[in-house]
A protein has these predicted regions:
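Intrinsically disordered, low-complexity terminal tails/loops enriched in metal-binding residues
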Residues: 17-151
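Sec-dependent N-terminal signal peptides
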Residues: 3-14
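N-terminal leader/targeting segments
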Residues: 1-3, 29
C-alpha cells in the first residue's frame, strides 16, 4: 500500500505544481490569450489582454492572494511568496465593471469618506454620471463592504 501512495502523491504534487490558470485572474470570466503570458516565480500566468498584464506587473503577490482559486499554479507557495505580508483590501471587485479585480493600485474615488476602487478613467466618468446607481447596486451585490459597514 505504501508503495502505491508514493507515486500517487508525487503525481498529485506534479499536477498541482504544473497547473495553470484557465481564465484571467483580473478580468474574471474572460478567456485567456496564450500570447498574454508572464512568468513569476517559475510559473506561467496567462491573461486576457495586455492591460491585465500591466496590472499584474504592478502587484502580482496581491493578485495571487486575492484570487487563489484562479491561480492554482501558486497553491502551497504562500510562505515562499510572503503572502502573509500582503494585506487585502475589503473591496475585491469594481462597482462599474464588477467582474474586474481591484488592487491597491486601482484608480479611486472618495464616497462618504471611504475609498472606492474603480477600473480606469472611463469607469470614473461612468461612475460620476450616476454614482448613486453604481453604489446602490454594488452594495446590494456585496462589492463595497467599506460602505456597507455600520458604525
Amino acid at each position: 500500500m505504501k508503495l502505491f501512495l508514493i507515486p500517487l502523491i508525487s503525481f498529485l504534487y506534479i499536477a498541482i505544481s504544473n497547473a495553470e490558470n484557465k481564465e484571467c485572474p483580473i478580468m474574471v470570466g474572460d478567456e485567456i490569450d496564450e500570447e498574454e503570458v508572464v512568468e513569476f516565480e517559475g510559473k506561467k500566468v496567462y491573461f486576457c489582454c495586455t492591460a491585465c498584464v500591466k496590472i499584474w506587473d504592478k502587484n502580482p503577490k496581491y493578485i495571487i492572494k486575492a484570487m487563489p482559486k484562479l491561480l492554482p499554479q501558486f497553491s502551497g507557495m504562500d510562505e515562499k511568496l510572503g503572502l502573509d505580508k500582503v494585506e487585502l483590501l475589503d473591496q475585491r471587485m469594481r462597482p462599474v465593471y464588477n467582474e474586474r479585480l481591484v488592487t491597491p493600485d486601482s484608480p479611486t474615488v472618495e464616497v462618504e469618506g471611504k475609498t472606492v476602487y474603480l477600473y480606469n478613467k472611463s469607469a470614473l466618468r461612468r461612475f460620476n454620471k450616476s454614482p448613486e446607481k453604481y453604489i446602490e447596486k454594488a452594495i446590494k451585490e456585496g462589492l463595497l463592504p467599506q460602505l456597507a459597514k455600520k458604525g
